[in-house]
C-alpha cells in the first residue's frame, strides 16, 4: 500500500497525487518539488489518513523493511519519525548496534517542520505510531525546525502515552 517515487521533480507532484487519490501512502525520493505542491500533497494525504513521506525523503523503514537509501537494521519495537535522512540513518544504526530494533522509520522530507509545511507528516506519523500496537517507543529527529512548529510537535509528543526520545538537530538555545 506504498508507492515509491524517484522521478524528476517537475513530474513528481501529479504522479504522487494520483497515488494518494488511489489510497496509497507515498514515499518520495523525488526532490525539486515545489513547496506549494508539497503542502497540497501532504494536506491531501492527511485528509485521506495516509502518509506523504517526502518529497526529498531518501530513508525509511516500513514494517522493519528498509526502503530506498536505508541501512538494514534489526526489527523491533521502536518507531522513528525523521525530517533528517542522515539522522534516521545514524539513530537506527545505533539502536541496532545497542541491541534494539526498529519497526518503522518514517521519513518526512527535510522541509516538513518549516513554517510553510507545519509538520503535517511528522504529526500524522507520531499519531500513527501512538496507535500502532507493536510500537513501544517513539523517536523524533528533525533538522532545525521553525520555533512555532517545533512547539506544536512537542505539545503533541507530551500528550501521547508512549515514551518519546526527540532531538531537533542544530537548534539554537531555546531559553525556555
Regions found by a protein language model. Give the residues of each.
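Catalytic-core regions of core metabolic enzymes
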Residues: 1-176
